[in-house]
């Protein structure tokens, strides 16, 4: 969608821009300059006391989306049960259709959830497990998902196969082969991260899915960090299930996620919650969670508008540029350990860095106490360092300050 089409299709609810002080078309024309990103930064109410390089847990909401959220809260509160009974589902369907265009799949295969954890749990707990079935996952997968698999394995008497994803693979084939060699006759499901949350490495999901399907194995993709981060289409991945959190890189309000279920699995999966027992129902039967903040769901539409205004590719390029700004000069420093690949197709914003002789928690503390840089320490098998996660509001000077801090600490 080009900028003219976008401006024409903006929903009224989203035109609460702090950019109202700007002329939007002229503002977008500055997209190739730092002026553009400074105006994006102005759309965020940032704490001036420290540099925030931890956008991986939760993306701060820009003012336009936040203003829209406040309006939606007022609307729902004003209408009360009238909204919940008469309008909630209609608006949810509208948001779902809009979102499906962004993620690249049919709205018939997509539901809104509260986060990736809920999405992946719906699949892991909803499959028809048989004693002896096998699940494959990696040490680098999200910790809570590993625990859920262990719990499910204990409950249904399943086996698990755990592998290690290399931080610096030679090529896609090395990754695909790793998963392929782990498959046995009893393997039913592979859980795989689209982007490894602790290193930022992007895995070749389509190739893994195609390979797994040759063995009759289903693939559940953890895409927590992917929607709104870099461009791809869920349909093109050829996966069976895909979960993501929209309060991360799409910058929707907290408690917004998605679950994609390939249509061929709609009747085979049991929902976590249910309003009825009709297994002939479509994707909607997986979306019932009881009463929850409906205004968060409506605000997803405003988050999409802001994302499209930024430009999907423009945002991805900017995030990768910020990554390169600090990682490339440090790649050959023998005291600094980068746990993220050097191939641009394998990363975007997120990277992980360690310094020899310093624990991840020590490095994180030094960065915050001495340099006022906030990040998160990661101490996991094969990955010991700090996860660095800039955002669209991060400017060049902040990245350079961080880079210089690492060099000073390493020296």
Task: Label every PLM stretch briefly.
Residues 2-411:
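Pyridoxal 5′-phosphate
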